[in-house]
Regions:
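Short, intrinsically disordered, charge-balanced linker/junction segments flanking boundaries
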Residues: 1-3, 176-181
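Aromatic- and acid-rich polysaccharide-binding/catalytic face
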Residues: 81, 146-171, 178
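Alpha-helix capping and helix-loop boundary segments enriched in small/acidic/polar residues
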Residues: 113-116, 168-172
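Hydrophobic beta-strand segments of well-ordered beta-sheets in folded domains
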Residues: 5-7, 76-77, 157-159
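Active-site neighborhood of glycoside hydrolase catalytic domains
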Residues: 54-155
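Active-site-adjacent "subsite" loops/lids of carbohydrate-active enzymes
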Residues: 5-70, 111, 123
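A cross-domain feature marking catalytic cores of carbohydrate-active enzymes
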Residues: 3-12, 82, 140-142, 163
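Aromatic- and acidic-residue-enriched segments that line the glycan-binding/catalytic groove
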Residues: 13-42, 80-105, 156-158
Length: 181
């Protein structure tokens, strides 16, 4: 009516239910521990999900269900939150890195692979969404759109700036960051 778009919000790499029901889908650090980027005592939902695991198909199934329930004609777009590069050394990432001839013992190589894998994930998910809803807007939120995102900008329909006057951002974050958006 007034041209205001309302995208559907969903999270990607944090999900309390998935964390509890599918520990085999969680990202693992070099010591074999689940990756918890927030350091919050349990109970929490901050164990990071590995996008190379069986979760990828689950996520696609969830997106398909959302699109079918909402209806393509009612879907303005999809805002996917909590997507970031992870120094993951789970069996899925190790196998994929080995296939690419990468050194799984090198943190630098693991982070290079993490960037590659996240870009690949965004491409796959964007193609998947657009195969069902060609006009849907797509945004992947990883806290900050910056240089690490540049390889996958083609997968975004637009860019957004997340800036809250709380936490680590504060009131001075938005004016400075918006000059670079």
């Amino acid at each position: 009516k007034r041209g205001i778009k309302v995208p559907v919000y969903t999270t990607a790499q944090w999900d309390g239910r998935i964390m509890r029901e599918h520990p085999e889908w969680l990202a693992v650090d070099e010591n074999g521990e689940f990756i918890d980027t927030q350091g919050v005592p349990a109970p929490h939902f901050y164990h990071t999900i590995c996008l190379n695991s069986g979760y990828r198909q689950f996520f696609k199934d969830q997106l398909q269900d959302m699109i079918e329930v909402i209806g393509v004609e009612n879907l303005d777009g999809i805002f996917m939150d909590i997507l970031f590069q992870v120094d993951c050394k789970c069996e899925h990432c190790v196998r994929k890195m080995q296939e690419l001839g990468m050194d799984t013992e090198s943190k630098v190589e693991r982070m290079r692979y993490a960037e590659h894998m996240l870009d690949e994930f965004k491409t796959e998910i964007s193609e998947f969404i657009h195969s069902m809803a060609p006009e849907a807007t797509i945004f992947y939120n990883g806290s900050h759109v910056g240089p690490r995102s540049k390889n996958s900008f083609k997968e975004y329909s637009h860019l957004e700036l997340e800036s809250l006057p709380s936490g680590g951002w504060g009131y001075d974050h938005f004016p400075a960051t918006s000059r670079y958006a």
